[in-house]
């Protein structure tokens, strides 16, 4: 018996810009006015959050997702992707978990090394803010998807 090798086409991640002129203009203006680094830290935390979603997406479906950058943030395009509630739970919880892990890592490093810094605390707090805001159970945020996956799992366990 011979085994057939699965040939997977490697597809690059596409980054789509919604209202590209407005998005890039706002980003350039805000970054040029960001003297304290608040926006850069928030942008780094948002990229970390979405990267975790993209890595879990890659692990589950063996391809990279399409990303959309708009004036309101970065999001993964999931239209047309068949997803079980368990996969939805894994995918939705990856971003907030990455933010929590980054926060704990920075705080633990500062505690063990004895090197406390304002920027370290700011990075930790911003990660908590990004992760916590995404845990709100509002449509479009990770919290709604996590609740859907959890309720489905609980409902499935208690059926007779």
Give, region by region, the residue ranges found by the protein language model.
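Hydrophobic transmembrane alpha-helices and their immediate loop junctions
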Residues: 1-160
């Amino acid at each position: 018996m011979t085994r057939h090798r699965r040939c997977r086409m490697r597809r690059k991640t596409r980054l789509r810009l919604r209202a590209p002129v407005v998005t890039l203009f706002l980003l350039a203006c805000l970054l040029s006015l960001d003297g304290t680094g608040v926006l850069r830290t928030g942008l780094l935390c948002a990229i970390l959050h979405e990267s975790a979603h993209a890595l879990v997406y890659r692990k589950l479906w063996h391809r990279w997702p399409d990303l959309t950058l708009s004036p309101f943030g970065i999001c993964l395009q999931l239209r047309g992707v068949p997803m079980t509630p368990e996969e939805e739970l894994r995918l939705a919880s990856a971003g907030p978990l990455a933010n929590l892990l980054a926060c704990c890592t920075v705080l633990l490093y500062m505690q063990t090394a004895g090197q406390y810094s304002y920027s370290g605390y700011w990075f930790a707090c911003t990660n908590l803010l990004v992760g916590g805001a995404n845990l709100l159970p509002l449509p479009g945020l990770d919290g709604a998807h996590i609740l859907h996956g959890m309720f489905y799992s609980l409902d499935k366990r208690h059926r007779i």
